[in-house]
């Protein structure tokens, strides 16, 4: 099993994407397509929250066609980040993080 490592910067956050194709021969045999694994981790700042994960780390499995239709691991993750960054919850969290807290 090969592993691809992709490094990107999104909104000033350095992010590592690990992509492992075809992680389960049993899945491929049962469903006729490979099951791929994606890991996304914010590196700098370390474990910085992202619109797709509050902890700065995400690990999920996807059928190969999802990865391919998204344009590959990097394009797919960038599209997710941009899409979920438009959510009202993410926008509110970003505003809150930028404001000073006088009581802590």
Task: Annotate each language-model stretch with its function.
Residues 37-104:
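Acidic, low-complexity intrinsically disordered segments
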Residues 1-34:
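Amphipathic, interaction-prone secondary-structure segments
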């Amino acid at each position: 099993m090969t592993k691809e490592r992709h490094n990107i910067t999104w909104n000033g956050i350095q992010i590592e994407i690990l992509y492992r194709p075809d992680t389960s021969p049993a899945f491929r045999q049962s469903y006729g397509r490979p099951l791929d694994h994606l890991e996304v981790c914010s590196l700098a700042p370390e474990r910085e929250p992202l619109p797709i994960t509050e902890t700065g780390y995400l690990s999920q499995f996807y059928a190969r066609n999802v990865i391919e239709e998204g344009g590959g691991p990097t394009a797919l993750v960038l599209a997710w980040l941009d899409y979920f960054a438009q959510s009202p919850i993410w926008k509110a969290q970003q505003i809150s993080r930028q404001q000073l807290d006088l009581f802590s």
